[in-house]
Amino acid sequence: MNILVINTGSSSLKYQLIDMTNESVLAKGVCDRIGLEHSFLKHTKTGGETVVIEKDLYNHKLAIQEVISALTDEKIGVIKSMSEISAVGHRIVHGGEKFKESAIIDEDVMKAIRDCVELAPLHNPSNIIGIEACKQILPDVPMVAVFDTAFHQTMPRHAYIYALPYEIYEKYKLRKYGFHGTSHKYVAHRAAQMLGKPIESLKLITCHLGNGASICAVKGGKSVDTSMGFTPLQGLCMGTRSGNVDPAVITYLMEKEKMNINDINNFLNKKSGVLGISGVSSDFRDVQDAAEKGDDRAQLALDIFCYGVRKYIGKYIAVLNGVDAVVFTAGIGENNAYIRREVLKDMDFFGIKIDLDKNEVKGKEADISAPDAKVKTLVIPTNEELEIARETLRLVKNL
């Protein structure tokens, strides 16, 4: 069974075609600059070369058509016709409280996704456009929505309710939702396999560290707390996001800097974090280069980030009453030995110790624990597309 996985952005569309008989990627690619000048499709057939096709992609429907053309092309394709696509799995950023797991897309599900637009105004509209475009091109193919928020719907009430008047939660569903759920779920299950233990018996802390970053406490395979909140702005200091700040800072700044709502949103989401502290970049590699050359602000940005991750790990060890493994994933978590080392230094008290040589690993699965560590430390590259494909298969196989 071949499953097409789609991740739609406002001007981009990423895709993978996965053969679920052996969970192998047949082809993958991205349509970029949709609706803009100089749009193109970048397509890679597994084992083949990457091809860039310049094409006027005025909208997402044209982008989907171009994806199907590439997948079925005699030279660069991997299937003979689009009838070989059994189902489509869509990444949806926000499912609100409505979706505790993935769902087959019908009119009711579409309405519920639209209802969540105000919770994710930057992402859900693009996700909806992607679904509608796919339905026009592949009208008879079942489609599944896989939500970034769904994995965290198992959090207990005391973990997700903010200490605001309860009526505000009831009126606006204003609460912690958490994000990166598909990634946290994938690496938690993979960690259980690597440890050779049933996930139901494990306490895990998963660290999704990329330009956006979040930590998750996983008990028995279920999320019990996570660092992101009502939006992805809560929690850790990130590439351009501030993470946790005293809420009073916002009104203070609005008054002092004469900022409006859009200004303060942009300030906290786009100009803060590692970029704001360092004044160098939101890319950790650039910031590390600057720090190594003696840039004090760059070093401070790295220290603040690592300190934040350390605090959440400590916090979640308390929440879980211990931990069996700490897992690092995503761009920084998978590839940055310095960040992993700084995050986990002086954690012997908790039984967490890493082997510095093993820690040099980049972009592949590894157990980097020291031989005498009581707690395992794992590096696991995330695979959100495969997790989306698995969820899609689970729901459509009995149709």
Curated annotation (Swiss-Prot):
Pfam families in UniProt: Acetate_kinase (PF00871)
Subcellular location: Cytoplasm
Class of the enzyme per the UniProt entry, highest EC level: transferase
PROSITE patterns, per the entry: ACETATE_KINASE_1 (PS01075), ACETATE_KINASE_2 (PS01076)
Annotated catalytic residues: D148
Cystines in this chain: none
Gene3D superfamilies: 3.30.420.40
Residue sites binding Mg(2+) per the record: N7, E384
GO CC terms in record: cytoplasm
Any one GO biological process: acetate metabolic process
Pathway this chain belongs to: Metabolic intermediate biosynthesis; acetyl-CoA biosynthesis; acetyl-CoA from acetate: step 1/2
Cofactor(s) it depends on: Mg(2+); Mn(2+)
Cofactor note as given: Mg(2+). Can also accept Mn(2+).
Entry binding sites for ATP: K14, H208, L209, G210, N211, G212, D283, F284, R285, G331, I332, G333, E334, N335
Stored InterPro entries: Ac/propionate_kinase (IPR004372), Aliphatic_acid_kin_short-chain (IPR000890), Aliphatic_acid_kinase_CS (IPR023865), ATPase_NBD (IPR043129)
Biological role: Catalyzes the formation of acetyl phosphate from acetate and ATP. Can also catalyze the reverse reaction.
Similarity section: Belongs to the acetokinase family.
Subunit structure: Homodimer.
Protein name: Acetate kinase
Organism annotation: Acetivibrio thermocellus (strain ATCC 27405 / DSM 1237 / JCM 9322 / NBRC 103400 / NCIMB 10682 / NRRL B-4536 / VPI 7372)
Phylogenetic classification of the source organism: Bacteria, Bacillati, Bacillota, Clostridia, Eubacteriales
